[in-house]
Curated annotation (Swiss-Prot):
The lineage of its organism: Eukaryota, Metazoa, Chordata, Craniata, Vertebrata. Residues 84-100, 153-159 are extracellular. The gene is HVCN1. This is Voltage-gated hydrogen channel 1. Its main location: membrane. One of its GO terms (cellular component) is plasma membrane.
Length: 235
């Protein structure tokens, strides 16, 4: 399974480290020294660049919550458009609701398109090393182009029966967006759990070392008591 999952990374992930992590999860147990090497504190940086700020923003929890919220709203808008296309819900006489839904959905797509542009600018070539991000950007760009075409040629697509098919293409964007957001959140949780695990492992090692020292101290005191006849040899 790891040989497939290792390809689905997002920007900010180290592909080599990502592959190694899956192999370590399959083995389930690693030495404490190897765990220490997996988690490294970020080095102190004297000068914070715009790219650094944007990378921190893209990996922040609030940003992911906003993206998930926009994806859910987009899903509801596309669902509403599909229901009206299938005549399950009848729009108003002047067809204002479909246009409002379409413009709102196009606005959300514009936000996603800007996000993709900033990610390419911030991460550069690293962006194209992560297939999940590339797939997401392709779906966003294609969906944006199709929505623009539908905005001016909707009647032509409706006449040939392609309108519903194009709406369904947006579902691919929604599903991919949800998977990407959930995966990023999961990566953050895994990172936090690994940090907690490292702290606990360090604490256990300290306690074990302390126990060994206590046992050695007890043995030393026992020998001293026996030497001075304060403790019988049978004790």
């Amino acid at each position: 399974m790891s040989r497939y999952l290792k390809h689905f990374t997002v920007v900010g992930d180290d592909p080599i480290q990502w592959s190694n992590d899956y192999q370590k999860w399959e083995n389930e147990e690693e030495d404490n020294g190897e765990k220490d090497s997996e988690i490294k504190l970020e080095p102190s940086r004297g000068h914070v660049t715009f790219q650094d700020v944007m990378k921190k923003l893209f990996s922040s929890r609030r940003f992911q919550i906003v993206i998930v919220f926009l994806v859910i709203v987009d899903a509801l808008l596309v669902l509403g458009e599909l229901l009206m296309d299938l005549k399950i819900i009848h729009p108003d006489k002047y067809h204002i609701a479909p246009k409002v839904f379409h413009y709102l959905s196009l606005s959300i797509l514009t936000i996603f398109l800007v996000e993709v542009g900033f990610k390419i600018f911030v991460y550069g070539r690293e962006f194209f090393h992560h297939k999940f991000e590339v797939l997401d950007s392709i779906v966003v760009v294609v969906s944006f182009i199709l929505d623009l075409v539908l905005l001016f040629r909707e009647h032509e697509f409706e006449a040939v029966g392609l309108l519903i098919l194009l709406r369904l293409w947006r579902v691919a964007r929604i599903i991919n967006g949800i998977i990407l957001s959930v995966k990023t959140r999961s990566e953050q949780q895994v990172s936090k759990l690994k940090q907690v695990n490292l702290k606990l492992a360090t604490k256990v090692e300290q306690l074990q070392h302390s126990c060994v020292e206590k046992e050695q101290e007890i043995e030393r005191l026992t020998r001293m008591l026996k030497q001075h006849g304060l403790l019988s040899e049978q004790t």
